[in-house]
Amino acid sequence: MTKELSIGSVKMGGGRLLVLIAGPCVIESEEATLRHAERLMTICNGLGMPLIFKSSYDKANRTSINAFRGPGMDEGLRILSKVKESLGIPVLSDIHSIEQVAPAAQVLDVLQIPAFLCRQTDLVVAAAKTGKVVNVKKGQFLAPWDMRNVVGKVAASGNENIILTERGASFGYNNLVVDMRSFPVMRSYGYPVVFDATHSVQLPGGQGESSGGQREFVETLSRAAVATGIDGIFMEVHEDPSCALCDGPNSIPLAELPALLKRLQALDAVVR
């Protein structure tokens, strides 16, 4: 069994109910962010599912220089603070440099280390030293057992509030595959493990100047991951993915989310 973490009002791990981490890929505007957060809260309250809202203030690893990156740290944190205060739900976002750690920690309940940066010791240690929950996404280039060393970096910094997230492994060019063995391997380190269901079906750079995606496989992979006993599911969602400013091809339409979550909850109840 994994360690139980307290994230605002949400409990994750330790045999608790499956937690949803969800939101638009990037903060598109204050109005859109609050609207998505309110809809997600309504959906999760109706299902009795714990929710952590996520959205990025800066997508620093977009495929093209012309791609929308978000409002930036200052404005993004202001918007996420408003979500947190007005709706009372925990919030998560990515950090990309040591300089971002302190201001982000003043607002965020979870500091997320992006997959491409999971080996950056100084960033991981700086995040850990805040005492905040740190969600480290497993790099597409790492084996699941390599995450033991990442866990060691966080724990050695005096922080055991750790989440590990699987988001697929590189499988040739412009493709990812999910190795289901990664879930029991990473859970064996004693901390909650999350499946990033939407980034795992991404086709990185697959559309030339942007990434493609195969959202039709999200449910299949999510069901398999939940059946292994994971602690949380991570999904990027949008009210209209065709108009999303980031990762639309692999985002889940909000209208389809309740039925999908209900099916995943049923599986979670069996394996709990």
UniProtKB/Swiss-Prot annotation:
Which SUPFAM superfamilies does the record cross-reference, listed alphabetically? Aldolase
InterPro entries, alphabetically?
Answer: Aldolase_TIM (IPR013785), DAHP1/KDSA (IPR006218), KDO8P_synthase (IPR006269)
**What is any one GO biological process for this UniProt entry?**
keto-3-deoxy-D-manno-octulosonic acid biosynthetic process
Q: In which pathway does it act?
A: Carbohydrate biosynthesis; 3-deoxy-D-manno-octulosonate biosynthesis; 3-deoxy-D-manno-octulosonate from D-ribulose 5-phosphate: step 2/3; Bacterial outer membrane biogenesis; lipopolysaccharide biosynthesis
EC top class, in one word? transferase
Domain of life assignment:
Bacteria
GO MF term set? 3-deoxy-8-phosphooctulonate synthase activity
Gene Ontology cellular-component terms listed: cytoplasm
Key words of the record: Cytoplasm, Lipopolysaccharide biosynthesis, Transferase
EC number(s) recorded for this UniProt protein = 2.5.1.55
- Which reaction equations make up its catalytic activity? D-arabinose 5-phosphate + phosphoenolpyruvate + H2O = 3-deoxy-alpha-D-manno-2-octulosonate-8-phosphate + phosphate
Fetch the Pfam families from UniProt: DAHP_synth_1
Cell compartments where the protein resides: Cytoplasm
The cross-references to NCBIfam families, in alphabetical order and at most eight, read: KDO8P_synth (TIGR01362), PRK05198.1 (NF003543)
Its family remark reads: Belongs to the KdsA family.
Q: What is this protein called?
A: 2-dehydro-3-deoxyphosphooctonate aldolase
Q: What is the lineage of its organism?
A: Bacteria, Pseudomonadati, Thermodesulfobacteriota, Desulfuromonadia, Geobacterales
